[in-house]
């Protein structure tokens, strides 16, 4: 694992800590998209965007920096890009995976699993995992609900590459 990226998170306007992601080498196109959206080097990205959907015991979803509600976002390659491969599985909590609207519809939205979610294998591209900051993810999970609506705003206040 080569590339590492981070999110600094606030919950309800208060700093909640840092999540560090270790990204997998065998999904280079997916990793490069996430990395560039963390640094903002293309003029757009994750900084200042929120986690719009958090379901306890399942996952925390973010990455819609255009609409903020799960309908938007875009990749560095244009609007959408293909599923690179399904080498990695949703085999444990704290996996980082691409959200999508079906086959080959990756943009910028992603999710962090908080449980084993093996029914997503072969449908969503897993491209990294949480290396540190599991406690921050758990704090985020605590403000989620079964509908996915958060009781407090969960924001990426800063992000980048380490």
From Swiss-Prot:
It is found in: Cytoplasm. Its EC number is 5.2.1.8. Binds cyclosporin A (CsA). CsA mediates some of its effects via an inhibitory action on PPIase. GO terms for molecular function: cyclosporin A binding; peptidyl-prolyl cis-trans isomerase activity. Keywords: Cytoplasm, Isomerase, Rotamase. Belongs to the cyclophilin-type PPIase family. PPIase A subfamily. This is Peptidyl-prolyl cis-trans isomerase.
């Amino acid at each position: 694992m080569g590339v590492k990226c981070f999110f600094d998170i606030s919950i309800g306007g208060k700093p909640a800590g840092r999540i560090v992601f270790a990204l997998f080498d065998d999904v280079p196109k997916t990793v490069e998209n996430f990395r560039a959206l963390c640094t903002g080097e293309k003029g757009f990205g994750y900084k200042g965007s929120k986690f719009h959907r958090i379901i306890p015991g399942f996952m925390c979803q973010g990455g819609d920096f255009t609409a903020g509600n799960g309908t938007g976002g875009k990749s560095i390659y244009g609007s959408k890009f293909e599923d690179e491969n399904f080498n990695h599985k949703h085999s444990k909590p704290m996996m980082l995976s691409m959200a999508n609207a079906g086959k080959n519809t990756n943009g910028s939205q992603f999710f962090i699993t908080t449980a084993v979610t093996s029914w997503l294998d072969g449908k969503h591209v897993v491209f990294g995992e949480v290396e540190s900051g599991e406690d921050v993810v758990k704090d985020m999970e605590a403000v989620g609900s079964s509908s996915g609506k958060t009781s407090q705003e969960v924001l990426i206040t800063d992000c980048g590459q380490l």
